[in-house]
Structure formats: C-alpha cells, structure tokens
C-alpha cells in the first residue's frame, strides 16, 4: 500500500466494498434443506442484509454428519442459488476442494475461502483464476503478514476483487469448549495501514 489514503473499491451485484457502506452477510451455517434456505433468504431480505450466506459443502469441526447431508451437498448449492434469485439477494458460499471451483463459481456471487484454507495456495490460485470476488478469512493462528501474503496469491493471478475477513483468534490456553474465537480488533486497523483491500469481520 503506497498511498495510505488509497482503498480498493468494487461492487458485487451492486453492493459496494471499500466505501462507506458496511455490507452485511446473513444466513445459516449450512444449507440443510430447500425450504429452510428459502425461509431464511426471505428473512435476510426483509431485515435488510446485503448477502445471503450458507455452506453447501460445509466443513465441520467433527466428521459426524447425516447421510442426507452427503447426498444433498450439490443440491444445497443450487438451493441457495435459487433462493438468492427468488429474493434478489446475492450469495456467498465456502469452497473446500479445488475440484469444485468451476461448479461453485457458476452459482455464487462471492467465493469464500475459510480460515482452514487461508494458506491452501493451490486452492487460492484456482479460485483467483475465476475472477470471481473472493472473501479470504484469516486463520485464527495466522499473523497479519501471513494473511496479506495469502491475499497476494489471489491478486497475483489478476483477480483484484479480494475481501479480507477477520475471523478471530483462538485462545487455546483456556481450553473452554463454550468459547471458540475472540475477535482481534487490533488486526483490522493494522491491516488497513498495510493494505488497500476492503476488510470485514465475522
């Protein structure tokens, strides 16, 4: 970032990033059924959020999931896409697997790369090549330098529509199962000093 006043701004489906607007993302952690995602999309639109989020290929902390989920993953992507169209709200969904890049890029408005894959460089590179807007979450143990370095992999492929997302940090020494991540408020202004990319938080 050569000029401290310079901030990249771009629009996704008419929603501007990098300006005064604070884009709001809302929706379920995982797309479980067609009816549920339609009902939630309707509420998201009514409440004024800008994007519908939902994981079709959702990674979970534990491997236990129903057989129904495994059968409906690809359908889930289509369900959230159709719900977004029905209520005229753009969508964002997470990608986990390079083999799904083309499929997910076809349906989503923003590709989300979760904290688990922040430094999965082959995945970053393949997603970047779609030229779709990409939200890059900071891994809970990653430094600011690591985070910005991961973003550079996307920018290097000519994709300038990168949104940084502060995910929070893990506090392992507490070993509390009731708490997951603590928002690192310090990293947001620190990142703004070093990068022109827009930043959101989860």
Which ranges hold each PLM region?
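Active-site mouth loops of central-metabolism enzymes
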Residues: 21-39, 62-70, 90-94, 114-115, ...
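Catalytic alpha/beta core domains of metabolic enzymes, predominantly
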Residues: 12, 17, 130-201
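Catalytic beta/alpha-barrel core
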Residues: 53, 69-72, 88-97, 109-122, ...
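Conserved, mostly hydrophobic/aromatic
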Residues: 27, 44, 52, 104, ...
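Alpha-helix-loop-beta-strand connector modules within alpha/beta enzyme cores
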Residues: 67-93, 126-133, 185-199
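N-terminal amphipathic alpha-helix/helix-capping segment at the start of soluble metabolic enzymes
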Residues: 1-25
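Short, well-ordered coil/turn segments that N-cap beta-strands
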Residues: 20-22, 48-50, 85-91, 107-109, ...
């Amino acid at each position: 970032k050569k000029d401290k006043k310079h901030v990249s701004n771009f629009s996704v489906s008419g929603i501007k990033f990098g300006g005064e607007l604070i884009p709001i993302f809302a929706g379920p952690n995982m797309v479980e059924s067609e009816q549920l995602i339609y009902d939630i999309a309707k509420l998201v639109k009514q409440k004024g959020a800008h994007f519908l989020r939902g994981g079709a290929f959702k990674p979970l902390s534990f491997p236990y999931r129903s057989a129904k989920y495994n059968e409906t993953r690809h359908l889930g992507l289509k369900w959230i896409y159709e719900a977004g169209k029905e209520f005229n709200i753009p969508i964002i969904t997470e990608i986990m697997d390079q083999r799904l890049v083309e499929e997910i890029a076809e349906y989503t408005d923003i590709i989300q790369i979760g904290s688990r894959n922040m430094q999965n460089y082959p995945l970053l590179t393949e997603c970047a090549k779609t030229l779709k807007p990409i939200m890059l979450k900071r891994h809970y143990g990653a430094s600011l330098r690591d985070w910005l370095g991961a973003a550079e992999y996307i920018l290097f492929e000519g994709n300038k529509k990168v949104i940084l997302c502060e995910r929070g940090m893990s506090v392992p020494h507490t070993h509390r199962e009731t708490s997951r991540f603590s928002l690192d408020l310090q990293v947001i202004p620190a990142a703004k000093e070093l990068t022109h990319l827009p930043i959101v938080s989860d």
